[in-house]
Amino acid sequence: MQDDDPELQKAVAAITQGDFELSFAIVSRLARADVALAQHFLGWHFHKGIGTDQDDSQAVHWWLKAARQGVVEAQQGLGWAYANGRGVEEDPVEAYRWFNRAASGGDEAAREGLLETAQRLSPEQLRSLEQES
């Protein structure tokens, strides 16, 4: 799915117009059809509680699906979730991994998260993670 996908544009327009439930319904349908960008947006809906109840564990579930398909914003979201223990157990090593993937994809917020997370890791952990890259 591309950013110019008509269904995705319809979901974005619904957000802009304040119709959060419609946006949630559209991205839910597309996400369940394994559309990566919609999976990221569905994670965002759950994370923010927009058009649905706030649920960080569901946000992580959908971000993980999108991240595995290369959506860097979802990778950054996972880094944030692991760094802060939101929807998953706090894990700075896993946060670093996801921030690193997103930063490699050009996500600026992930670069900041990567630097902040690196400060929470031991030199041994950093060396090990750098060898993974």
Question: Model features per residue range: what roles?
Answer:
Residues 109-133:
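Terminal, low-structured helical/coil segments at or just beyond the last alpha-helical repeat
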Residues 5-10, 41-48, 52, 77-84, ...:
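Hydrophobic face of amphipathic alpha-helices that form TPR/SEL1-like repeat modules
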Residues 1-6, 29, 124:
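TPR-adjacent "capping" and linker segments in tetratricopeptide-repeat scaffold/adaptor proteins
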